[in-house]
Amino acid sequence: MDVRITIETTFDNGEKRTHQLDGISRPYRVTCPDGIGLRLEDGKRVVEQIQRAILCDQVEEIIRESRVCPDCASVRAIHDYRTRDLDTLFGRVRVKAARLRRCSCDARSAAMPGGPISPLAYFFPDRATPELQRLHAELGSRHSFREAARLMKSFLPCHPPHHTTVRDRLGRVAAGLEKSRRASGDPAEALPKG
């Protein structure tokens, strides 16, 4: 038996794109009990390919939509392209990300001086999805950092994290939670300690 996996993306503008992923082969005559169904390695590979197809299409759409200036609706020029490695729960994906020139009408140019705009930086400020960062923080708070990295490598197709990456992301998530708690004026902070 051969299984083919195809993904079809329909963009907001109506354009359609088809991605052909790797197939899975399970010949009947050589099937053993271990070869029944989808194995962990097969699942990790397929999910990683699905993630790559979806993320690349999303990045393309983000860049296309970001080219339109929000102030005057003119199309901003592309400054250059850079490759970015984006860490997701289902794998590390290398994408080609455009940086855009600032529009001449941009009223915020004085407030935000600088060169090209990277639309991808808004969605991936740490080049990792928030879901992956939360999982690193969750596992890092429950296990040693090395064990958390080992667990992720065993069960997920994501790029195997180094234990220091788990530690650093736990620290950033904790700092973000602390910052949002202080900004909300948490009454628990006003209570006397001890």
Protein language model annotation of sequence segments:
Residues 1-104, 110:
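Short, conserved DNA-binding cores of transcription-related domains
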Residues 92-193:
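Short, positively charged, Gly/Tyr-enriched micro-motifs
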